[in-house]
Amino acid sequence: MAIERTFSMIKPDATKRNLTGAITKIFEDNGLRVIASKRVWMSKREAEGFYAVHKERPFFGELVDGMTSGPTVVQVLEGEGAILKNREIMGATNPANAAEGTIRKIHALSIGENSVHGSDAPETAAVEIAYWFSETEIVG
């Protein structure tokens, strides 16, 4: 498999419970390197822009409110097959359906407070990484 980069976000429900280190350790223990990371408090405008693809969905307002409720850690992860590997490590969006040992099974509170976000494809990874990081902030 090729070395890839993917975008990862540790959401406010997890940062409020001081889980940043525990979640990052899971990524690293599974062969992903953190090559960029910063802690941000999303503005409403940033959250609406980042999640614009969901704008017409009924949960959009609740999503924006949740993402602006506390600090978020945005990261770029790198490794072999990083996009798929990250998705496997995170587990299903709904923690009730997540496999044992995944981040969401271990740490998520609900489908709305599911602790992490990760890119689903190379194209979305590129867009999401560029949304939060300049090239000089990514140090591989």
UniProtKB/Swiss-Prot annotation:
GO CC aspect terms: cytoplasm
Cofactor: Mg(2+)
Record key words, sorted: ATP-binding, Cytoplasm, Kinase, Magnesium, Metal-binding, Nucleotide metabolism, Nucleotide-binding, Phosphoprotein, Transferase
Entry annotated with the keyword Phosphoprotein: yes
NCBIfam families, per database record: PRK00668.1
InterPro entries from the UniProt entry: NDK-like_dom, NDK-like_dom_sf, Nucleoside_diP_kinase, Nucleoside_diP_kinase_AS
A Pfam cross-reference name: NDK
Binding site for ATP: K11, F59, R87, T93, R104, N114
PROSITE patterns membership: NDPK, NDPK_LIKE
Subcellular location as annotated: Cytoplasm
GO molecular function: ATP binding; metal ion binding; nucleoside diphosphate kinase activity
Annotated protein name in UniProt: Nucleoside diphosphate kinase
Species assigned in the record: Rhizobium rhizogenes (strain K84 / ATCC BAA-868)
GO biological process, one term: UTP biosynthetic process
The EC number(s) this enzyme carries: 2.7.4.6
Protein task: Major role in the synthesis of nucleoside triphosphates other than ATP. The ATP gamma phosphate is transferred to the NDP beta phosphate via a ping-pong mechanism, using a phosphorylated active-site intermediate.
Gene from which the chain derives: ndk
Family: Belongs to the NDK family.
CDD domains: NDPk_I
